[in-house]
Amino acid sequence: MWTFERMKRVILILLGLLLAFFAFLAWYKATYSMDVVSERSSGPEDAAQRVLVATQGSTYKDLVTDHVIGHLTDQSIAVQVVDVTMLGSVDASPFDAVVILHTWENWEPQPDAQAFLNAHPDRTRFVVLATSGGGDEMIEGVDGISSASVMDEAQADADNLIARLDRVLARGRAPVSPSSR
């Protein structure tokens, strides 16, 4: 038989567990959510080649992005950097290549990155770096690499991404246009 004291204790335990669960969710979001990246440009405005870099803010992605931008500006290539969440409003056609650095969220690619790639079935101009907890998740049908955001591997991952990007840029310019749906 349930006494008032026993019911009270069970309710307090359940409330405590619920509170702990929500505290965990808040901690997880604060620890693992991506920062928003400020839009910026670098390189000469009259450059022969232009690259769009869409990324999310994290220490690892910032380091990889900085390496990519440094490499491109050293080659006098214009670079436009936007947050991945802005991809829906970006026209990819003026760019010779598009680099997307995104994280997997809830076992799926970042929604804006996936929607942008879905809108561009010819992905020959795209290079993607996908980060996930295990470093093994990747969007199918696009050139790129996957990483677990290990800081000690950021330079090697950036070099890998740059090598892929250089191959895209060496092929020359072809139109990058969304699918006609």
Language-model features: where?
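Structural motif
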Residues: 97-99
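Short, Lys/Arg-rich N-terminal segment immediately upstream of the first membrane anchor
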Residues: 1-7
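Short, charged N-terminal beta->alpha structural module
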Residues: 47-78
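A short, well-structured beta->alpha microelement
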Residues: 75-91
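Solvent-exposed, acidic/flexible segments
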Residues: 54-65, 92, 106-110, 151-158
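Hydrophobic membrane-insertion alpha-helices, especially the h-region
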Residues: 8-27
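Surface-exposed acidic loop/strand-edge motifs in secreted or periplasmic proteins
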Residues: 68, 82, 102
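FMN-binding flavodoxin-like domain, especially the glycine-rich phosphate-binding loop
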Residues: 21-48, 74-75, 102, 108-181
